[in-house]
């Protein structure tokens, strides 16, 4: 039997659980670290660590693909990561950023339709509408209304992530670690420049950062990016992305639970309903993509 059609076995499901736990913990450890390090500078430190770890392993892209690779790095490394950590810093909770970030999946479907001419059926269209409606419902939760700018920043971050994932489809010959390595290498200097401009005193404040701040940046690079994405890459070599994606929706669910149990989140009815709509819509998009053998955007985290 073809492994891609056989579904995920027990060992692969354990890998999925490790990935989801690694990505969910990233929300918690990053939120703690962002209390000590400004978000853009934190993102730059994460990418510095990642660049140092991967620079010896990156492969050059094929001829003519350097501009595309730089565009992907700016979308994913600078704007997605930078804005998502800024959103997490402002939010004061883990639940809403973890859920809203998943809206990049319907956004990527729309961008693939617009840029690449990919078509989707009415069921996928309904799933996209349900996801976006869920963001609106979630936005009226009292916990979210305390910092509406956080919701807006995460939505903009998701737009850049969707754009980056669609552009990545045009890259060829690069493995996941080369993509991550180049994203880190190209992203560091713009983020440092943005931090110097928008976060005055951020560099000087690093002398007061404790192991919580530095450890959060290290975990974000090693635990979330290297471990989480490394295992994810192993899975998608064996199974279609659309087959793996539904299982990875456990990650935002675990992040919400960590937010409630550890971080002190108190989500209201609107967040539970809106969150279910967002994740339900993403699940339907993944299931329709699997049924129609249509490409899915790769799973991402902050």
Question: Which role fits each region the language model picked out?
Answer:
Residues 33, 42, 87, 114-116, ...:
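Hydrophobic/aromatic residues within transmembrane alpha-helices
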Residues 1-41, 143-170, 189-193, 258, ...:
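Glycine-/small-residue-enriched transmembrane alpha-helix faces in small-molecule transporters
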Residues 10-15, 41-56, 71, 126-130, ...:
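Hydrophobic alpha-helical transmembrane segments of multi-pass integral membrane proteins
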Residues 48, 54, 76, 111, ...:
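Hydrophobic transmembrane alpha-helices of multi-pass small-molecule transport proteins
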Residues 21-27, 55-101, 109, 137, ...:
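Specific transmembrane alpha-helical segments of multi-pass solute transporters/efflux pumps
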Residues 1-9, 43-47, 140, 213, ...:
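C-terminal-most transmembrane helix of multi-pass membrane proteins
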Residues 41-51, 85-119, 157, 241-260:
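Specific alpha-helical transmembrane segments that line the substrate/conduction pathway
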Residues 63-68, 95-101, 117-137, 144-151, ...:
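Loop-to-transmembrane alpha-helix entry segments
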